[in-house]
Amino acid sequence: MSSRKKVLLKVIILGDSGVGKTSLMNQYVNKKFSASYKATIGADFLTREVLVDDRQVTMQLWDTAGQERFQSLGVAFYRGADCCVLVYDVNNSKSFDALDSWRDEFLIQASPRDPDNFPFVVLGNKIDMEESKRVISTKRAMTFCQSKGNIPYFETSAKEAINVEQAFEVIARNALMQEESEEFSGDFQDPINIHIENDRDGCAC
Protein backbone atom coordinates (compact mmCIF):
# COMPACT_ATOMS: atom_id res chain seq x y z
CA MET A 1 0.00 0.00 0.00
CA SER A 2 1.65 3.23 -1.15
CA SER A 3 -0.39 5.26 1.33
CA ARG A 4 1.40 3.70 4.28
CA LYS A 5 3.92 5.96 5.94
CA LYS A 6 7.62 5.40 5.43
CA VAL A 7 9.28 3.50 8.23
CA LEU A 8 12.60 4.42 9.82
CA LEU A 9 14.37 1.44 11.37
CA LYS A 10 17.14 2.10 13.86
CA VAL A 11 19.76 -0.66 13.98
CA ILE A 12 22.64 -0.61 16.47
CA ILE A 13 25.84 -2.46 15.57
CA LEU A 14 27.94 -3.47 18.58
CA GLY A 15 31.17 -5.36 19.15
CA ASP A 16 34.79 -4.92 20.13
CA SER A 17 36.98 -2.43 18.32
CA GLY A 18 38.49 -3.84 15.13
CA VAL A 19 35.95 -6.60 14.42
CA GLY A 20 34.76 -4.87 11.23
CA LYS A 21 31.57 -3.04 12.19
CA THR A 22 32.34 0.00 10.04
CA SER A 23 33.47 -2.22 7.16
CA LEU A 24 30.24 -4.24 7.24
CA MET A 25 28.16 -1.04 7.20
CA ASN A 26 30.12 0.42 4.31
CA GLN A 27 29.93 -2.80 2.32
CA TYR A 28 26.16 -2.97 2.83
CA VAL A 29 25.40 0.72 2.17
CA ASN A 30 28.13 1.78 -0.27
CA LYS A 31 29.33 -1.56 -1.69
CA LYS A 32 32.86 -0.54 -0.76
CA PHE A 33 35.65 -1.95 1.39
CA SER A 34 38.73 -0.12 2.65
CA ALA A 35 41.53 -1.72 4.64
CA SER A 36 42.50 1.65 6.12
CA TYR A 37 39.48 2.54 8.25
CA LYS A 38 40.16 4.54 11.38
CA ALA A 39 38.59 3.54 14.67
CA THR A 40 35.12 5.02 15.13
CA ILE A 41 35.05 7.82 17.70
CA GLY A 42 31.77 7.92 19.60
CA ALA A 43 29.22 6.87 17.00
CA ASP A 44 28.40 7.30 13.35
CA PHE A 45 25.51 6.18 11.16
CA LEU A 46 24.69 5.42 7.54
CA THR A 47 21.28 4.99 5.93
CA ARG A 48 19.97 2.78 3.14
CA GLU A 49 16.47 2.49 1.73
CA VAL A 50 15.29 -1.07 1.22
CA LEU A 51 12.13 -2.96 0.40
CA VAL A 52 11.01 -5.43 3.06
CA ASP A 53 8.01 -7.54 2.07
CA ASP A 54 6.82 -4.79 -0.31
CA ARG A 55 7.26 -2.17 2.41
CA GLN A 56 9.63 0.75 1.81
CA VAL A 57 11.86 1.23 4.85
CA THR A 58 14.88 3.37 5.68
CA MET A 59 17.57 1.50 7.58
CA GLN A 60 19.52 3.76 9.92
CA LEU A 61 22.65 1.83 10.88
CA TRP A 62 24.49 3.06 13.96
CA ASP A 63 28.13 2.12 14.29
CA THR A 64 29.22 2.68 17.88
CA ALA A 65 32.81 2.72 19.08
CA GLY A 66 34.01 -0.56 20.52
CA GLN A 67 36.30 1.07 23.06
CA GLU A 68 35.11 0.81 26.65
CA ARG A 69 35.67 4.53 27.29
CA PHE A 70 32.86 5.32 24.84
CA GLN A 71 30.29 2.93 26.32
CA SER A 72 28.89 5.74 28.48
CA LEU A 73 27.51 7.25 25.25
CA GLY A 74 25.15 4.28 25.14
CA VAL A 75 21.82 5.57 26.37
CA ALA A 76 21.41 8.28 23.73
CA PHE A 77 22.40 5.98 20.88
CA TYR A 78 20.69 2.77 22.00
CA ARG A 79 17.25 4.17 22.85
CA GLY A 80 14.62 3.57 20.20
CA ALA A 81 16.56 0.78 18.51
CA ASP A 82 14.58 -1.79 16.52
CA CYS A 83 17.35 -4.40 16.25
CA CYS A 84 20.83 -4.93 17.67
CA VAL A 85 23.63 -6.56 15.67
CA LEU A 86 26.45 -8.17 17.65
CA VAL A 87 29.68 -8.53 15.67
CA TYR A 88 32.81 -10.51 16.50
CA ASP A 89 35.92 -11.59 14.59
CA VAL A 90 36.05 -15.38 14.04
CA ASN A 91 39.85 -15.12 14.40
CA ASN A 92 39.70 -13.38 17.78
CA SER A 93 38.36 -15.29 20.79
CA LYS A 94 38.28 -12.18 23.01
CA SER A 95 35.83 -10.47 20.66
CA PHE A 96 33.57 -13.55 20.79
CA ASP A 97 33.72 -13.78 24.59
CA ALA A 98 32.67 -10.10 24.75
CA LEU A 99 29.35 -10.71 22.95
CA ASP A 100 27.56 -11.48 26.21
CA SER A 101 28.61 -8.21 27.82
CA TRP A 102 27.71 -6.21 24.67
CA ARG A 103 24.27 -7.83 24.69
CA ASP A 104 23.77 -7.10 28.39
CA GLU A 105 25.03 -3.54 27.91
CA PHE A 106 22.50 -2.97 25.14
CA LEU A 107 19.56 -4.31 27.15
CA ILE A 108 20.49 -2.13 30.13
CA GLN A 109 21.01 1.04 28.10
CA ALA A 110 18.18 0.63 25.58
CA SER A 111 15.60 -0.67 28.07
CA PRO A 112 13.39 -2.30 25.39
CA ARG A 113 9.74 -2.88 26.28
CA ASP A 114 10.09 -6.67 25.91
CA PRO A 115 13.78 -7.57 26.47
CA ASP A 116 13.21 -11.33 26.20
CA ASN A 117 11.93 -10.99 22.65
CA PHE A 118 14.03 -8.08 21.41
CA PRO A 119 15.67 -9.00 18.07
CA PHE A 120 19.42 -9.56 18.00
CA VAL A 121 21.50 -10.86 15.09
CA VAL A 122 25.07 -12.19 15.50
CA LEU A 123 27.68 -11.79 12.75
CA GLY A 124 30.96 -13.72 12.78
CA ASN A 125 33.10 -11.51 10.56
CA LYS A 126 36.43 -11.86 8.69
CA ILE A 127 35.85 -15.38 7.35
CA ASP A 128 37.98 -14.40 4.32
CA MET A 129 41.16 -14.85 6.36
CA GLU A 130 43.18 -18.07 6.39
CA GLU A 131 41.31 -21.00 7.93
CA SER A 132 44.33 -21.73 10.15
CA LYS A 133 43.83 -18.37 11.89
CA ARG A 134 40.25 -19.11 12.83
CA VAL A 135 39.69 -19.74 16.54
CA ILE A 136 35.87 -19.68 16.89
CA SER A 137 34.09 -22.56 15.16
CA THR A 138 30.67 -22.26 13.55
CA LYS A 139 29.36 -24.82 16.04
CA ARG A 140 30.53 -22.82 19.05
CA ALA A 141 28.97 -19.63 17.70
CA MET A 142 25.67 -21.35 16.93
CA THR A 143 25.58 -22.91 20.39
CA PHE A 144 25.92 -19.42 21.88
CA CYS A 145 23.11 -18.07 19.67
CA GLN A 146 20.81 -20.97 20.54
CA SER A 147 21.43 -20.42 24.25
CA LYS A 148 20.23 -16.82 23.87
CA GLY A 149 16.88 -17.68 22.32
CA ASN A 150 17.91 -18.80 18.82
CA ILE A 151 19.50 -15.55 17.66
CA PRO A 152 19.98 -15.58 13.85
CA TYR A 153 23.66 -16.15 12.99
CA PHE A 154 25.67 -15.33 9.87
CA GLU A 155 29.34 -15.72 9.01
CA THR A 156 30.43 -12.74 6.97
CA SER A 157 33.28 -11.06 5.17
CA ALA A 158 33.02 -7.32 4.68
CA LYS A 159 36.10 -7.51 2.46
CA GLU A 160 34.70 -10.14 0.07
CA ALA A 161 31.03 -9.14 0.55
CA ILE A 162 30.17 -12.66 1.76
CA ASN A 163 26.71 -12.97 3.38
CA VAL A 164 26.50 -9.21 4.01
CA GLU A 165 23.32 -8.65 1.96
CA GLN A 166 21.73 -11.83 3.33
CA ALA A 167 22.48 -10.87 6.92
CA PHE A 168 21.12 -7.34 6.60
CA GLU A 169 18.00 -8.64 4.88
CA VAL A 170 17.20 -10.62 8.04
CA ILE A 171 18.21 -7.65 10.20
CA ALA A 172 15.80 -5.39 8.27
CA ARG A 173 12.95 -7.88 8.48
CA ASN A 174 13.40 -8.46 12.22
CA ALA A 175 13.74 -4.73 12.85
CA LEU A 176 10.51 -4.05 10.95
CA MET A 177 8.66 -6.69 12.98
CA GLN A 178 9.95 -5.07 16.17
CA GLU A 179 8.95 -1.58 15.00
CA GLU A 180 5.44 -2.77 14.13
CA SER A 181 4.99 -4.56 17.46
CA GLU A 182 6.14 -1.42 19.31
CA GLU A 183 3.69 0.65 17.26
CA PHE A 184 0.85 -1.73 18.06
CA SER A 185 1.58 -1.93 21.78
CA GLY A 186 2.00 1.85 21.87
CA ASP A 187 -1.66 2.21 20.93
CA PHE A 188 -2.59 0.58 24.21
CA GLN A 189 -0.05 2.20 26.49
CA ASP A 190 -2.50 3.71 28.95
CA PRO A 191 -5.48 1.41 29.51
CA ILE A 192 -8.60 3.12 30.78
CA ASN A 193 -10.20 1.43 33.76
CA ILE A 194 -13.93 1.96 33.91
CA HIS A 195 -15.41 1.39 37.33
CA ILE A 196 -19.20 1.55 37.61
CA GLU A 197 -20.69 1.79 41.04
CA ASN A 198 -24.22 0.56 41.38
CA ASP A 199 -26.10 3.00 43.61
CA ARG A 200 -28.97 0.88 44.89
CA ASP A 201 -30.56 3.75 46.82
CA GLY A 202 -30.44 6.22 43.97
CA CYS A 203 -33.11 7.26 41.57
CA ALA A 204 -33.49 5.07 38.50
CA CYS A 205 -34.87 7.91 36.37
From Swiss-Prot:
Instruction: Quote the InterPro entries the UniProt record gives.
Output: P-loop_NTPase, Small_GTP-bd, Small_GTPase
User: Its Gene Ontology biological processes?
Assistant: protein transport; regulation of vacuole fusion, non-autophagic
Indicate where a lipid (S-geranylgeranyl cysteine) is covalently linked.
Answer: 203, 205
Q: Name one Pfam family in it.
A: Ras
Transport found in the keyword field: yes
Q: Which residues carry this modification: Cysteine methyl ester?
A: 205
Its chief place of residence is membrane
How does this chain sit within the bilayer?
Lipid-anchor
Query: Motif location (Effector region)?
Result: 37-45
What protein family does this chain belong to? Belongs to the small GTPase superfamily. Rab family.
Tell me the PANTHER family matching this sequence. RAB FAMILY, RAS-RELATED PROTEIN RAB-7A
This protein's name: Ypt/Rab-type GTPase Rab7
Q: Could you tell me which species this protein originates from?
A: Neurospora crassa (strain ATCC 24698 / 74-OR23-1A / CBS 708.71 / DSM 1257 / FGSC 987)
From which lineage does this chain's organism come?
Eukaryota, Fungi, Dikarya, Ascomycota, Pezizomycotina
